[in-house]
């Protein structure tokens, strides 16, 4: 028996793949007129499908990507002859964020004011009030002394050690012991 004949007689499992392909083609066909779509070769249609997939993937990742030329505001008709510019229900444009989530997280702490510490958890007020700078004078809980104002202004430098904010502070002290090699002691 010939192997090619057996392969040809087997029912194909490409039904799902062909459905996905036709759905992708229908999505792309909305950007072209009926005449343009009929003139296009299969390879051109596939390349447009991949362009649209790449564009959608990049925007989901948060990159600022320019819209492919065929997806720009071009008046096109679907296969029923309806203009998409007139049909607002079918052509809803979603506003894409211009900024990634990571950039937004770095900006928000600068914009948002710091919350005042609770009186029960404020350990800085006691130690700073009796320091040599204050000459033993008590400070009001809402007012900061001049050294605190200077320290607030001179925060960590932006470009230097950018990863340090990601490190967590250890709750328990970790002690390391040096491991000695018995062979080194003999020498």
UniProtKB/Swiss-Prot annotation:
Residues 152-168 have a biased composition (Basic residues). The gene is SSX8P. It comes from Homo sapiens. Not detected in any normal or tumor tissues. GO terms for cellular component: nucleus. PROSITE patterns: KRAB_RELATED. One of its GO terms (biological process) is regulation of DNA-templated transcription. This is Putative protein SSX8. The keyword Secreted does not apply. Residues 20-83 form the KRAB-related domain. The modification Phosphoserine is found at residue 123.
């Amino acid at each position: 028996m010939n192997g090619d004949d057996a392969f040809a007689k087997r029912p194909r499992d490409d039904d799902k793949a062909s459905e996905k392909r036709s759905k992708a083609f229908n999505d792309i066909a909305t950007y072209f007129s009926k005449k343009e779509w009929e003139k296009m070769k299969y390879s051109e249609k596939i390349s447009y499908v991949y362009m649209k997939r790449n564009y959608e993937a990049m925007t989901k990742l948060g990159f600022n990507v320019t819209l492919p030329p065929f997806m720009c505001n071009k008046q096109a008709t679907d296969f029923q002859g309806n203009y998409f510019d007139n049909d607002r229900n079918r052509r809803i444009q979603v506003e894409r964020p211009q900024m990634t989530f990571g950039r937004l997280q770095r900006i928000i702490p600068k914009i948002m004011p710091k919350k005042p510490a609770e009186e029960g958890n404020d350990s800085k007020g006691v130690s700073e009030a009796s320091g040599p700078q204050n000459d033993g004078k008590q400070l009001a809980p809402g007012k900061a002394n001049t050294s605190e104002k200077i320290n607030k202004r001179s925060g960590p430098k932006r470009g230097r050690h950018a990863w340090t904010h990601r490190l967590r502070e250890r709750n328990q002290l970790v002690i390391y012991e040096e491991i000695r090699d018995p062979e080194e002691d003999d020498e």
